């Protein structure tokens, strides 16, 4: 029996479920790609394209066809058996509260947990509707009940930071600080690719949305090992010859579409001289990032202390490979001579002119075709035109002195970093796919419950709500729009503002976060991908050997956002629910 008398609740739920999914794209997905963009492994536009494809494919392809009526299992839905429309109202209030809070958090650049946001909304409406006794504060297992939120504040960042630190330290002392690190990377990169593929296969097998495999444990182990070995072999055959031509021989004529040629690339002739205006085959991943000596020289020059500036420049240029913070083997890849006392402004690496997708507003009245088309482009592509990397260098209340922060971190060999950029792209894309497969339920799970209650007029059986494909497409589309239009706001507040990012660091962060999600999935521990990547970023930053490489003010700001997520969303939802169900009306005397 369709509850047509509550069509307005379905309409309101649809609007705010779209806003909730939009915020997941602008907040949750954006912080997943922040490290890759900050490390220059991908451009912002490339991150938007890859993120959109992987999130949409994960959501629609293997997204949950069946969602828990209340995903976080903090309110007993059987209490609403006699009044299913009241649960419908409660879920609408929860989605409204979650979307409002996420909008505020995204506006202020706070990376927050969307799972905890919707949980707060459900708790608030549950207290207002059935009282505090109807809320499951402590569950029968570690992943049930409200207490799981508090455990997640410690478990997620702690585990992710530990795993990411181990991965980066192995990379640091096994490759980056060794003599000839590029050749060491040629050995380690295929192994890392195989390990990463095996771990991501494990994640898909254990947390793969609606398509649950029915394999025995030995079959699962064999599949994981087989996928890892096969991927490592493919990388060795096809990618490594291409990287050899690019990194070692500096073949400036090669493009990414030459990768399928594999071993045939080794038979190419001598590399012709590059064009005079060429900027090199491998980009400088540390462009605009200063070492301590370079920063001291530039600031001394700005303060008029020419003697100190000259001394710092001489010290730095006389030993360009001198490690920072007492480390050995690290390579400084920038020319210090540009930081002489003759420069009163910061020396910046030459940046190519960025061609915007929106362009200037054409002349004419607002209702003309050209101007209206420009407004459409502005709405769709304004976010893509944002210069995220430059924004991360700007000072703000929470960004501290970013240049000083980066000066305490070591700069490793640039060509070696280039090889790790491909690993980082792989981990980010795969993490985005699994995020779409699972976390889209934060937005469409409650909405699917509202839709089924409206359609059937009764509680879903066994606390499960069917999720039609059109709802998955609806949620995934709103998520992608949020990523494209406002994802830059979270990205520019993260990445290099927490610690110095580079491909080797970013790969370690993302893989450490993925390992944490895999382990938590298997052990059913309550973790958030947002909290995992933040903990991994801090863990890798501390591997520089000093706490000064971390922007603790920003970390505290992020933690504050986690702390207030559940109570703020709960208060908004509870107030809405309480006001509505207790509101005076005609003929009501109670």
From Swiss-Prot:
<comment type="similarity">
    <text>Belongs to the inorganic phosphate transporter (PiT) (TC 2.A.20) family.</text>
</comment>
<feature type="transmembrane region" description="Helical">
    <location>
        <begin position="186"/>
        <end position="206"/>
    </location>
</feature>
<keyword id="KW-0472">Membrane</keyword>
<feature type="transmembrane region" description="Helical">
    <location>
        <begin position="6"/>
        <end position="26"/>
    </location>
</feature>
<feature type="transmembrane region" description="Helical">
    <location>
        <begin position="527"/>
        <end position="547"/>
    </location>
</feature>
<protein>
    <recommendedName>
        <fullName>Phosphate-repressible phosphate permease pho-4</fullName>
    </recommendedName>
</protein>
<keyword id="KW-0812">Transmembrane</keyword>
<feature type="transmembrane region" description="Helical">
    <location>
        <begin position="561"/>
        <end position="581"/>
    </location>
</feature>
<feature type="transmembrane region" description="Helical">
    <location>
        <begin position="467"/>
        <end position="487"/>
    </location>
</feature>
<dbReference type="GO" id="GO:0035435">
    <property type="term" value="P:phosphate ion transmembrane transport"/>
</dbReference>
<feature type="transmembrane region" description="Helical">
    <location>
        <begin position="149"/>
        <end position="169"/>
    </location>
</feature>
<feature type="transmembrane region" description="Helical">
    <location>
        <begin position="85"/>
        <end position="105"/>
    </location>
</feature>
<comment type="function">
    <text>High-affinity transporter for external inorganic phosphate. Acts probably as a sodium-phosphate symporter. Component of the high affinity phosphate transport system II (ptsII) necessary for scavenging phosphorus from the environment under conditions of limiting phosphorus.</text>
</comment>
<feature type="transmembrane region" description="Helical">
    <location>
        <begin position="118"/>
        <end position="138"/>
    </location>
</feature>
<feature type="compositionally biased region" description="Polar residues">
    <location>
        <begin position="313"/>
        <end position="322"/>
    </location>
</feature>
<keyword id="KW-1133">Transmembrane helix</keyword>
<feature type="region of interest" description="Disordered">
    <location>
        <begin position="297"/>
        <end position="361"/>
    </location>
</feature>
<feature type="transmembrane region" description="Helical">
    <location>
        <begin position="44"/>
        <end position="64"/>
    </location>
</feature>
<keyword id="KW-1003">Cell membrane</keyword>
<feature type="transmembrane region" description="Helical">
    <location>
        <begin position="506"/>
        <end position="525"/>
    </location>
</feature>
<keyword id="KW-0813">Transport</keyword>
<feature type="topological domain" description="Cytoplasmic">
    <location>
        <begin position="267"/>
        <end position="466"/>
    </location>
</feature>
<feature type="compositionally biased region" description="Basic and acidic residues">
    <location>
        <begin position="325"/>
        <end position="345"/>
    </location>
</feature>
<feature type="transmembrane region" description="Helical">
    <location>
        <begin position="246"/>
        <end position="266"/>
    </location>
</feature>
<keyword id="KW-0592">Phosphate transport</keyword>
<dbReference type="InterPro" id="IPR001204">
    <property type="entry name" value="Phos_transporter"/>
</dbReference>
<keyword id="KW-0769">Symport</keyword>
<dbReference type="GO" id="GO:0005436">
    <property type="term" value="F:sodium:phosphate symporter activity"/>
</dbReference>
<dbReference type="Pfam" id="PF01384">
    <property type="entry name" value="PHO4"/>
</dbReference>
<dbReference type="GO" id="GO:0005886">
    <property type="term" value="C:plasma membrane"/>
</dbReference>
<feature type="transmembrane region" description="Helical">
    <location>
        <begin position="220"/>
        <end position="240"/>
    </location>
</feature>
């Amino acid at each position: 029996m369709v509850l047509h008398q509550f069509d307005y609740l379905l309409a309101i739920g649809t609007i705010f479920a779209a806003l909730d999914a939009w915020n997941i794209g602008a907040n949750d997905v954006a912080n997943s790609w922040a490290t890759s963009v900050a490390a220059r492994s991908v451009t912002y536009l490339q991150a938007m394209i890859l993120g959109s494809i992987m999130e949409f494919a994960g959501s629609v392809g293997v997204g949950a066809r069946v969602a828990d009526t209340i995903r976080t299992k903090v309110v007993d839905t059987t209490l609403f058996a006699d009044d299913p429309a009241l649960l419908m109202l409660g879920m609408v209030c929860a989605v409204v509260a979650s979307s409002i809070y996420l909008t505020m958090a995204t506006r202020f650049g706070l990376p927050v947990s969307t799972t905890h946001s919707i949980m707060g909304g459900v708790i608030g409406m549950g207290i207002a509707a059935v009282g505090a006794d109807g809320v499951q504060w402590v569950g029968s297992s570690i992943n049930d009940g409200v207490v799981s939120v508090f455990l997640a504040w410690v478990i997620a960042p702690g585990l992710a930071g530990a795993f990411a630190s181990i991965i980066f330290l192995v990379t640091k002392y096994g490759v980056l600080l060794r003599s000839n690190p590029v050749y060491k990377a040629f050995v380690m990169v295929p192994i890392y690719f195989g390990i990463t593929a095996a771990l991501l296969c494990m994640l898909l097998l254990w947390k793969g949305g609606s398509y649950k495999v029915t394999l025995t444990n030995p079959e699962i182990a064999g599949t994981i090992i087989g996928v890892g070995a096969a991927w490592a072999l493919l990388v060795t055959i096809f990618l490594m010859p291409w990287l050899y031509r690019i990194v070692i021989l500096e073949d400036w004529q090669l493009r990414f579409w030459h990768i399928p040629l594999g071993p045939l690339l080794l038979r190419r002739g001598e590399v012709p001289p590059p064009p005079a205006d060429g900027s090199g085959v491998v980009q400088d991943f540390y462009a605009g990032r200063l070492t301590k000596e370079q920063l001291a020289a530039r600031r001394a020059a700005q303060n008029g202390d020419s003697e100190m500036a000259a001394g710092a420049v001489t010290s730095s240029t006389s030993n360009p490979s001198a490690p920072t913070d007492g480390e050995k083997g690290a390579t400084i890849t920038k020319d210090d001579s540009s930081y002489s006392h003759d420069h009163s402004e910061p020396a910046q690496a030459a940046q190519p002119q960025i061609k915007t997708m929106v362009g200037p507003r054409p002349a004419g009245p607002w209702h003309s075709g050209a101007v209206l088309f420009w407004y459409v482009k502005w709405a769709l592509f304004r976010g893509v035109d944002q210069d995220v990397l430059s924004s991360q260098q700007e000072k703000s209340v929470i960004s501290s002195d970013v240049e000083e922060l980066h000066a305490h971190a070591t700069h490793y060999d640039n060509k070696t970093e280039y090889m790790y950029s491909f690993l980082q792209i792989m981990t980010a894309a795969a993490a985005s796919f699994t995020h779409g497969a699972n976390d889209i339920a934060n937005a469409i799970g409650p909405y699917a419950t509202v839709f089924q209650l409206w359609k059937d007029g009764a509680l879903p059986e066994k606390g499960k709500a069917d999720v039609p494909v059109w709802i998955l497409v609806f949620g995934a589309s709103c998520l992608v729009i949020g990523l494209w239009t406002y994802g830059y706001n979270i990205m520019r507040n993260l990445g290099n503002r927490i610690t110095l990012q580079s491909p080797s660091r970013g790969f370690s962060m993302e893989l450490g976060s993925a390992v944490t999600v895999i382990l938590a999935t298997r052990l059913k521990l309550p973790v958030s991908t947002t909290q995992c990547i933040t903990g991994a970023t801090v863990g890798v930053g501390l591997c520089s050997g000093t706490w000064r490489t971390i922007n603790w003010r920003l970390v505290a700001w992020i933690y504050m956002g986690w702390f207030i997520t559940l109570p703020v969303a709960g208060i908004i939802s509870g107030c809405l629910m309480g006001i509505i169900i207790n509101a005076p009306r005609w003929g009501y005397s109670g």
